[in-house]
């Protein structure tokens, strides 16, 4: 899904992509910045309604991105432990502790 990839891209703006850095979630782009970015992604010719739909999809996938990569890190910790030198469980903690994850799970159940 393109919207999932874009949500992941925006979270990467926050850093914390390695095991030693704490993500700075305040770096997540504002709604206006996200909209401008999506308009550019769609070539600047998309109808405003199409941009709105894509932005809403990005917002839906944003917490799922944390869930996906957090669970990925847990499985990597179980499979690899510390053999790679990467602290998977710390990374998982960073991703899974974001408030949007609990909100998304709460809406789903």
What are these regions (language model features)?
Residues 71, 76, 80-109:
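Regulatory N- and C-terminal appendages and interdomain linkers associated
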């Amino acid at each position: 899904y393109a919207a999932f990839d874009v949500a992941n891209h925006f979270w990467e703006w926050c850093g914390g992509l390695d095991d030693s850095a704490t993500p700075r979630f305040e770096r997540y782009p504002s709604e206006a910045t996200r909209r401008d970015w999506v308009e550019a992604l769609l070539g600047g010719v998309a109808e405003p309604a199409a941009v709105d739909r894509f932005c809403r999809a990005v917002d839906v996938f944003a917490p799922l991105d944390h869930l996906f990569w957090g669970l990925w890190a847990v499985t990597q910790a179980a499979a690899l432990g510390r053999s790679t030198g990467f602290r998977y469980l710390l990374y998982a903690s960073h991703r899974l502790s974001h408030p949007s994850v609990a909100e998304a799970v709460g809406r789903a159940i």
